[in-house]
């Protein structure tokens, strides 16, 4: 009969005007059951490692993407969706409580506090949060001609100012290689060899930076075209040596990561990271140490983002 079942009845709460989509009424037990059952089915029956929840900010804020008059404040006059907040706490408590080792990952683009905090500490309870700030600063820096990178040096160091505010995952996701944004290789400046050299440096810096890692498929062998769900990856590129070299380089970085605890065991502890020199602006060099918990198996990273050799 057209009566809203899963969404809010009031269109000011039940619709996203920009997307033309409905918003779940998280206060309804049947909606909560439907969503949590779906999450559990994927993890417990299909055995996926975890779930990434898209556009979390759109659920947390009642005024997300809306103008004055298009939204209704909560009972306290604020713009927080209290039902959605309670739902996320419940969802993550149930899923992670029943499935040890599973991951619940939030794609959340604002400064909402404690996204990965424990629900009993008023956190949302996610395992990891996408580090959207790092991703934006990092990709914008890497697009620059090395000659001009000195003017954007701070973009590569700023992420360490907030790196421990959440349990972050560094993401170079599908969102960054679609809609005319270019593949990771074609984001790099220069021609031919220069693009591949820049990509190697980028992946090395990412490996050393605190936070878990996510690299979208195809970028590990330097896919040329943007990703499209309508075709497979361009696997034929692996017949060419530069693409083989990138794949081997990324394999080696993963091996380095897996076999060196300094790269992950203190990811959420400031004691695990130390700048050696973050202010070498003129030469566009970043140097830092990743510390292991016992401080005996530390790793030094020196990343040079110019094509100039720096023997010292």
What are the roles of these predicted feature ranges?
Residues 13, 47-49, 64-229, 258-268, ...:
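Conserved alpha/beta catalytic core and glycan-binding cleft of carbohydrate-active enzymes
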Residues 1-79:
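Substrate-binding/active-site clefts of carbohydrate-active enzymes
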Residues 228-240, 250:
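Aromatic-rich peripheral "rim/lid" segments of glycoside hydrolase catalytic domains that contact
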Residues 241-267:
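Catalytic cores of secreted or luminal carbohydrate-active enzymes
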């Amino acid at each position: 009969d057209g009566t809203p079942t899963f969404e809010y009845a009031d269109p000011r709460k039940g619709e996203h005007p920009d997307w033309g989509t409905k918003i779940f009424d998280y206060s309804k037990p049947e909606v909560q059951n439907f969503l949590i059952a779906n999450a559990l089915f994927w993890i417990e029956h299909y055995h996926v490692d975890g779930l990434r929840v898209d556009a979390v900010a759109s659920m947390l804020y009642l005024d997300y993407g809306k103008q004055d008059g298009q939204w209704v404040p909560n009972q306290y006059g604020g713009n927080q969706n209290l039902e959605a907040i309670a739902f996320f706490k419940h969802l993550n408590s149930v899923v992670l409580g029943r499935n040890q080792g599973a991951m619940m990952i939030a794609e959340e683009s604002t400064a909402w506090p404690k996204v990965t905090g424990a629900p009993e500490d008023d956190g949302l309870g996610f395992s990891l949060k996408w580090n959207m700030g790092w991703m934006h600063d990092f990709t914008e820096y890497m697009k620059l001609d090395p000659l001009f990178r000195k003017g954007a040096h701070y973009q590569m160091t700023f992420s360490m100012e907030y790196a421990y505010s959440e349990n972050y995952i560094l993401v170079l996701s599908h969102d960054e290689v679609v809609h005319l944004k270019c593949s990771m290789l074609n984001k790099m400046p220069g021609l031919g060899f220069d693009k591949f050299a820049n990509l190697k440096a980028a992946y090395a810096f990412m490996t050393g930076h605190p936070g878990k890692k996510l690299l979208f498929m195809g970028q590990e062998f330097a896919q040329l075209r943007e990703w499209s769900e309508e075709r497979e990856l361009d696997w034929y590129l692996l017949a060419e040596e530069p693409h083989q070299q990138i794949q081997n380089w990324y394999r080696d970085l993963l091996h380095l990561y897996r076999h060196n605890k300094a790269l992950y065991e203190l990811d959420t502890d400031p004691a695990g990271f130390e700048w050696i020199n973050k202010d070498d602006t003129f030469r566009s060099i970043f140097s830092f140490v990743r510390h292991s918990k016992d401080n005996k198996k530390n790793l030094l990273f020196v990343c040079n983002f110019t094509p100039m050799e720096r023997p010292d």
